[in-house]
Amino acid sequence: MSSSMLPVALQNKLVGYGRASSAHLSALNIDLIRNIVFILFIFRYTRKTFYSLRGYGIFGSIRNVYISLRLFFYGIFLRIPGVRGQVDKQVKEAITNLETKLVNTGPDVVRYLTLPKEGMTPEQVRAELDKLAGLEHTRWEDGRVSGAVYHGGEELLKLQAEAFGQFGVANPIHPDVFPGVRKMEAEVVSMVLALFNAPSDGAGVTTSGGTESILMACLAARQKAFLERGVTEPEMIIPDTAHAAFIKACNYFKIKLHRVPCPEPEFKVDINAVRRLINPNTVLLVGSAPNFPHGIVDNIPALSKLATKYKIPLHVDCCLGSFVVALLKKAGFPEPYEEDGGFDFRQPGVTSISVDTHKYGFAPKGNSVLIYRNKSYRNNQYFIYPDWSGGVYASPSVAGSRPGALIAGCWASLMSIGETGYINSCTEIINAARKFETSIRTDSTISLHMEVIGNPIVSVVAFRSKNGAIDIYDIADDLSAKGWHLNALQSPAAIHVAFTIPTAKAVDQLIADLSEVIGKELEKAEERRAQGKAYILKRGDTSALYGVAGSIPDKSVVSRLAEGFLDTLYKA
């Protein structure tokens, strides 16, 4: 057995020194880790503050803080028992009114809440379908609905129904079982790629609509940034006028959103503001061609330059413009930014474009196409899981099974109408939009009190009250009373008309009715001035809703009304 030559007392002293040094080293390590964490914390939030100040400026950042505080305290105010009770009462009344208008009632209305014990005969089912089709509704057939129904004609509807019948059981998730659907889907994507001047290695997918196309484009951009640059806190920059689907995508996929103003008089995205907001976490820039609210095409060439310079994907939302914006030049109209190289894949920075074939492609509802500059961009939206016990799983988008009948209906529409047919419809629609725009600018009655927003060059024309003498939402309600279903806008308060083939045929009546209701509102305004406080103001639905939305900073009440509306859709 070995032993130390050192005295026991010295050995104990050395052991004590060793223990003290070990404890001291541990304390140093803990302090070091704490300091590193603190430095990283300071760096992280200093960096965030720097990018916020650079993007929004000092006053813009202060304004953002002020808005957040105002919303917070207003939310507290709305939760005060007396206030909350009054708000709850009014919200309940409004939702009850919604149900009265939307849920069909009466002695002739039969509600089917459970499966029938015995199935109906085909004749009985057809009779019920005829009743449902005949329920009172806004007459889109007469061209009185803005957008919504992009109707290609009765013959096309019959052809689409035949395509549905042939491929009603088809599902593109099984290409070996339904090879015809696979072929049609690939050809639809190819046709849309050609319309938007994609390079030879362009790629795309079909989706259920514009929202899904936008969601997938945002997801692909987020995944690309994560895989290639390691971005874990993604950010996206969009115009204020971009479609709400981009905001939905940020909510779903946890992407920080920056909304950039679209200042008057052009109402296009502020390019300098976009530039200031770009930082290492930016995963996507967005432009619209055109945007939904005002029908304005953002400065895509300028956005493309930013995207190229900073190596960031750029998505162009052509969901609304669809085939009309793609064929403007061939129809004899000015193309957006033609002198600067166009608005599509001819711009080197454009990496993806969303196009709704169920709008001006006149395909059945539930059809849209998302196209990419190349396959590598598209691959970022794929979901692949090779370890599932059910086998290797792969899907191109959020959906698994998809209706092959919709793809067949879309393919049949594109093949039936052809380029010449789409050019003709583009001509008819744009001529109607220009006629309506001209009437607002030049009509002796309309031009005195209304003005066009920006310079729309596609199918959407938005207008607002010029001098404040007339509430634009009262105009919307008056037109609704005449059977029109137009779109009310906010920030600024306005109305827009998205022209379709049915609407184009009714443009003269729309102009006449607009002039008439303006005269009516002028008479009401004069009566209001004469009676003063004794005048009883009656507000229509649009005026009441958007009047509330614009007058309070906290939109929770409006959100509750919207939630009630959605609930009403599922009340049998």
Regions found by a protein language model. Give the residues of each.
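Active-site nucleophile and cofactor-binding loops and adjacent substrate-binding regions
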Residues: V177-V181, G204-T211, I238-P239, G454, ...
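Active-site phosphate-binding strand-loop segment of PLP-dependent enzymes
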Residues: V269-V316
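Active-site C-terminal subdomain of aminotransferase-like
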Residues: L327-S459, F463-G468
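Non-catalytic terminal extensions of PLP-dependent enzymes
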Residues: S2-R182, A186-S190, I423, K435-E437, ...
